[in-house]
């Protein structure tokens, strides 16, 4: 409710939409491969753009390229967590009829997708560099070091509960990415 007082009635729409899709995800959407798209939307675009909307003065309300790039990049980095989770659960999901992206493309391509999604999230930072925020591109590149190490471990483990360690490392990497982008944008 305080967000509505501060951000206006648009925040009611955002809140209701988030609630609706969180419910739909637990029912049908996760069974038809929509998880990755929903992560990009509701862990990337919605929180980053709405935070910008709430924090910027009314006369600066237009969304900038930096905001859109940051939101997509955040969604992509967070999607790596969903990829690992679905990779770990691929056999159970297949048996349950849950057609995640990982089930659709198989384990081999999914492992590469994990690596590529993290790489492209960092590559999106080039937009920051072209707009003069050089450090917002350079610092998040440190994330790639940890991301590649985690990927190499993931490939060796392949499947099972040992992948829980990879989930933890991926969550840590996401934290590093967010911290490094934030510091880079402040410099």
Annotate each language-model stretch with its function.
Residues 1-26, 116-160:
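Transmembrane helix-loop-helix
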Residues 7, 28-32, 58-67, 132, ...:
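Membrane-helix interfacial "entry" motifs
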Residues 12-16, 37-41, 67-72, 111-115, ...:
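Hydrophobic alpha-helical transmembrane segments
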Residues 49-59, 175-187:
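Hydrophobic alpha-helical transmembrane segments in multi-pass integral membrane proteins
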Residues 39-90, 109:
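Functional transmembrane core segments of multi-pass inner-membrane proteins
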Residues 21-43, 90-115, 151-180:
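Interhelical loop and helix-boundary elements at the membrane-water interface
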Residues 33, 54-59, 88-92, 132-136, ...:
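Membrane-interfacial segments
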Residues 1-58:
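Intramembrane alpha-helical segments
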């Amino acid at each position: 409710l305080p967000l509505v007082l501060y951000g206006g009635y648009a925040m009611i729409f955002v809140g209701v939409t988030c609630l609706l899709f969180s419910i739909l995800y637990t029912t049908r959407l996760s069974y038809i491969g929509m998880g990755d798209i929903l992560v990009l939307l509701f862990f990337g675009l919605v929180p980053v753009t709405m935070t910008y909307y709430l924090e910027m003065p009314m006369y600066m309300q237009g969304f900038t390229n930096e905001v859109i790039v940051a939101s997509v990049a955040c969604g992509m980095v967070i999607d790596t967590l969903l990829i690992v989770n679905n990779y770990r659960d691929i056999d159970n999901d297949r048996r349950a009829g849950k057609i995640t992206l990982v089930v659709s493309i198989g384990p081999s391509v999914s492992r590469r997708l994990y690596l590529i999604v993290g790489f492209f999230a960092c590559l999106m930072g080039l937009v920051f560099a072209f707009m003069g925020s050089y450090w917002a591109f350079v610092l998040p590149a440190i994330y790639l070091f940890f991301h590649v190490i985690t990927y190499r471990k993931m490939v060796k483990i392949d499947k099972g509960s040992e992948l829980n360690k990879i989930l933890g490392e991926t969550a840590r990497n996401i934290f590093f990415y967010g911290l490094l982008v934030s510091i880079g944008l402040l410099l």
